[in-house]
Swiss-Prot record:
One of its GO terms (molecular function) is thiamine pyrophosphate binding. GO terms for biological process: glycolytic process; tricarboxylic acid cycle. SUPFAM superfamilies: Thiamin diphosphate-binding fold (THDP-binding). Its EC number is 1.2.4.2. This is 2-oxoglutarate dehydrogenase E1 component. It comes from Staphylococcus aureus. Gene3D superfamilies: 3.40.50.12470, 3.40.50.970, Multifunctional 2-oxoglutarate metabolism enzyme, C-terminal domain (3.40.50.11610), TPP helical domain (1.10.287.1150). Pfam families: E1_dh, OxoGdeHyase_C, Transket_pyr.
């Protein structure tokens, strides 16, 4: 029986959704034990016969005992699975449940006397030594599962995790707050609520997106950070929307009241910035509203010196979630070493605060949670807190989601969910304690649903009774949490009623004192809002030179593999060609090899590289091969982990099939680690618009709004090659529309050596005031094009060139054609077949900032020039034409004719038929090269 007992101990204590089936099988077992599988025979025989599990019932027949046990099992399982539906988690306006499973003892034809005759072990094996009988154990379970915390965990597939949660929840435990801690907790709430009341009274109608109704969020965060400090976690990354943000800034990040009140008065808050440098607040030249701003606090207030960051955030709900995850991973990764980074999940943790309407409503949440257990993205478990005020602006839950709870969507990610009454502050603290213990044990996400209400409208100018009159009748009558908890402490004798009111008044006095320090006349005056001088120039070329032998040593190392490593023969032939630029006079470096050489030299310079995207390890077009696979064993080898004299890490991951969360993650990673060369590669550039929110609200505007620098690089495959409207265009026009104030660099290249120098220039700019995003319209067919490939001597010296020209005789040129990327190559190859010295092709490699000076200098050298043409593949209303036209119009003035050649205006980017594509493409080339 020893082995049999072990098997039972490892089996689930409850059968979840399979309980009905298991009970039917148990009936079959009673009739014929051989009718069920052997493992169930072991389990059922112990349930039926073993006194240590189920002792004989008093005064009943054995058959009745079996029936009674089955009913007890049903009751127990229902309480665990559905007790949350009757839990006391609603401070006000509890919902009316229409369909609640049976949860009472009487529902199962059981009574106290019967249950007292059954061992507590039948309820749960860990109850056997705690309670005298099943009745006592079930009372405990009812109190736990129907109390102020509602637990959902039976959906979790991992039995170890489920068992851990069951024991942690059901074992008698109470948050042991002594009287001093309770007083401190009351004071925290008084500060939280007092702050909101002061602003409400003194700045009537000003938007602040009050925390009132879910005030417990602040002490929950404080508890979380304190526990993290005890665990040695010294970097806390928080993401949240605007609801309650000002309160978190003041009471978690310790932003002085003077600074916050100054922002309401439109005076300069930076005059009150702590002189000790503990609070970092960046600001852009155009700025943002106060409830979008974040900050970084370095403090030992929570038990050890910690860095607590609240991420800047736009109004786009939930979009900050992947940014916070990326920032956390950056803090966890050690990148200043050769090889791959090492990740220590104990260095940092993410806390993401959601809204109850936005959490199930915004798909970015599901994309972000999907990153949780992936090697390239895991942060060791995120704490998710839903500030559930049970309304979204004016929309009530019945119109906001198709599920019972806003958190139901998280069940698919196998994480525990705790719903907690926001008015029961001690319960909210316990929920945090259990969540942090689970995270520490299993390194997985936990979701806490903080169920409260919204004291006022969506914003303080909004009247909620217009659309939600009935709920607000009850909310207005409902005491705030500082009074709910304060009165509880008065009743317990922890504080007196006078002490309660005295401290509430003291908070108002402190706020008034802070208010009085501010000079109302000290208004901010910055109407010009000029960008900083550091951004006056475009991305500067990196002029470092390399010897032939240096690059050859790197190349040889990248083509050297471990003994016994078996590369697919077909691939090996491709890789062996990378020796040719170094041992053949006519050898050329193609795009992929140029990238490998650039990456290797960047790693030697001490700049870490992180490259992610769908299929990025191989490359969508089978060109990169950064990760090699042994064709016999499947083992992998990454050559860029073995660069000679490597000083920083190379990290590459195939991403999940997601754009928004992955780009947000990489953006956040680079913001946190500005030395890191982060690159996101789209499978096709056409799919980049799935992350348009990140581009619009973070990447291209963050520095102007928040002073938040990023050097994230985007590789977006872009070219018209007959593959239809969804595999042709990275929507170049949209990036050029976002480009302003030297906020980025946008390129479409035609030379592998220029690509090499561009990557080095971007890497050199990182962690400087000149850093900015880089957008590369990367090639597809040009990856293997010999016109694009260049000899090695173009790599040993020189730098990035914003324009490239063919050789020409100045006095013979009558027409200049400006083109970019593949269009330039198509024109060049066509012109090579029918040479015409009167036509000069110019490759515009850098589109933004537009190379006006370089083009102007070139045109000035051409005395017989008559016409300047812009040629593009894209439709006239897309691509670069509408962007370049004002620049080129000024350059040609009335000296030359200006013409456009490209597709006509179209609603869709490209033709669907490949043959039609060829006809249109050839017509563009023919018309462009025609010399009138």
């Amino acid at each position: 029986m020893t082995n049999e007992r072990k098997e039972v101990s490892e089996a689930p204590v409850n059968f979840g959704a399979n309980l009905g089936l298991m009970l039917d099988l148990y009936d079959d077992f009673l009739q014929d034990p051989s009718s069920v599988p052997e493992d169930l025979q072991v389990l059922f025989s112990i349930i039926k016969n073993d006194d240590s599990i189920v002792p004989a019932l008093k005064s009943t027949s054995s058959q009745n005992s079996d029936g009674t046990i089955k009913r007890v099992m049903r009751l127990i399982d229902n309480i665990r699975q559905y007790g949350h539906l009757k839990a006391d988690i609603y401070p006000v306006n509890p919902p009316k449940r229409k369909h609640v499973p049976k949860l009472e003892i009487e529902d199962f034809d059981l009574d106290q006397q019967t249950l007292e005759g059954i061992s507590a072990g039948i309820v749960s094996d860990h109850f056997a030594d705690i309670y005298d009988n099943a009745y006592e154990a079930i009372l405990r379970m009812e109190k736990r599962y129907k109390g102020p915390i509602a637990f959902e965990y039976t959906h979790i597939n991992n039995n170890t995790e489920r068992g851990w949660l069951k024991r942690r929840i059901e074992t008698p435990y109470k948050v042991t707050l002594n009287n001093n801690e309770k007083r401190a907790l009351f004071k925290q709430l008084a500060y939280v609520e007092g702050f909101e009341k002061y602003l409400h009274k003194n700045f009537v109608g000003a938007k602040r997106f009050s925390i009132e109704g879910v005030d417990a969020l602040v002490p929950m965060l404080q508890r979380t950070i304190t526990i993290a400090a005890k665990e040695g976690i010294k970097n806390i990354q928080i993401g949240m929307a605007h609801r309650g943000r000002l309160n978190v800034l003041t009471h978690v990040l310790e932003k002085p009241y003077e600074m916050m009140i100054s922002e309401f008065m439109h005076t300069d808050p930076m005059k009150f910035l702590p002189e000790d440098g503990s609070l970092q607040l960046t600001a852009g030249w155009t700025g943002d509203v106060k409830y979008h701003l974040g900050g970084i606090k370095t403090t030992d207030s929570y038990g050890t010196m910690q860095r607590i960051a609240l991420a800047n955030n736009p109004s786009h709900l939930e979009i900050v979630a992947p940014v916070v995850e990326g920032r956390t991973r950056a803090a966890q990764d050690d990148t200043q070493r050769a090889g791959a980074p090492t990740t220590d999940h104990h260095k940092a943790m993410p806390i993401i605060i959601h809204g109850d309407a936005a959490y199930p409503g915004q798909g970015i949440n599901f994309e972000t949670m999907n990153l949780g257990n992936l090697k390239g993205y895991s942060t060791g478990g995120s704490l998710h807190i839903i500030t559930n005020n049970r309304i979204g602006f004016t929309t009530e839950p019945i119109d906001a989601r198709s599920t019972t709870y806003s958190t139901d969507v998280a069940k698919g990610y196998d994480v525990p969910i705790f719903h907690v009454n926001a008015d029961d502050v001690e319960a909210t603290i316990e929920a945090i304690d259990i969540a942090m213990e689970f995270r520490k044990e299993f390194h997985k996400d936990v979701v806490i649903d903080l169920v409260g209400y919204r004291r006022f409208g969506h914003n303080e100018m909004d009247e909620p009774s217009i659309t939600n009159p009935v709920p607000y009748q009850n909310i207005r009558k409902h005491d705030s949490v500082e009074y709910v908890f304060g009165k509880k402490l008065v009743n317990e004798g922890v504080i007196s009623e006078d002490e309660m009111h005295s401290f509430i008044e003291q908070v108002q006095k402190e706020l008034r004192q802070a208010h009085d320090k501010i000079n109302k006349a000290d208004k901010m005056d910055n109407p010009d809002m000029e960008k900083p001088a550091e951004l006056a120039l475009p991305l500067q070329a990196d002029e470092q030179s390399f010897t032939f032998d240096h690059l050859k040593e790197i190349n040889d190392a990248l083509l050297t593999y471990p003994d016994g490593f078996n590369i697919l023969k077909k691939l090996n032939k491709v890789l062996e060609k990378r020796h040719e630029p170094f041992n053949k006079e006519d050898g050329l470096v193609d795009w992929a090899q140029a990238e490998q050489l650039a990456f290797a030299t960047i790693l030697q310079d001490g700049t870490p590289i992180r490259l992610t995207g769908q299929d990025s390890e191989r490359g969508t077009f089978s060109h990169r091969h950064a990760v090699l696979h042994d064709e016999q064993t499947g083992e992998t080898y990454t050559p860029l982990h073995h660069v000679p004299d490597q000083k920083a890490t190379f990290d590459i991951h195939n991403s999940p099939l997601s754009e928004a969360a992955v780009v947000g993650f990489e953006y956040g990673y680079n913001v946190e680690n500005k030395k890191s060369f982060n690159i996101w590669e789209a499978q096709y550039g056409d799919f980049a618009n799935m992350s348009q929110m990140i581009f619009d609200n973070f990447l291209f505007s963050s520095r102007s709004k928040w002073g938040e620098r990023s050097g994230l690089t985007l590789f977006l495959p872009h070219a018209y090659e007959g593959q239809g409207p969804e595999h042709s265009s990275a929507r170049l026009e949209r990036f050029l529309q976002l480009a302003a104030e030297n906020n980025c660099t946008v390129v479409n290249l035609s030379s592998s050596s220029n690509y090499f120098h561009l990557l080095r220039a971007q890497a050199a700019s990182l962690d400087s005031e000149q850093m900015r995003p880089l957008v590369v319209m990367s090639p597809k067919s040009l990856l293997r094009n010999k016109t694009v490939a260049k000899p090695i001597d173009e790599f040993t010296s020189g730098g990035f060139e914003p324009i490239l020209t063919e050789s020409y005789q100045a006095d013979k040129v009558t027409k200049v054609i400006l083109a970019t990327g593949k269009m330039f190559i198509d024109l060049k190859e066509a012109l090579a077949k029918n040479p015409d010295e009167s036509v000069l092709l110019v490759a515009i490699e850098r589109l933004y900032p537009f190379p006006e000076e370089e083009i102007e200098a070139l045109l000035a050298q051409l005395p017989k020039l008559e016409e300047v043409s812009w040629v593009q593949e894209e439709p006239k209303n897309q691509g670069a034409w509408l962007y370049v036209y004002p620049y080129v119009k000024v350059l040609v003035a009335d000296k030359y004719d200006l013409s456009y050649h490209g597709r006509i205006q179209r609603a869709a980017p490209a033709e669907g038929d490949g043959e039609i594509h060829k006809l249109v493409q050839n017509k563009i080339i023919e018309n462009a090269l025609k010399n009138n």
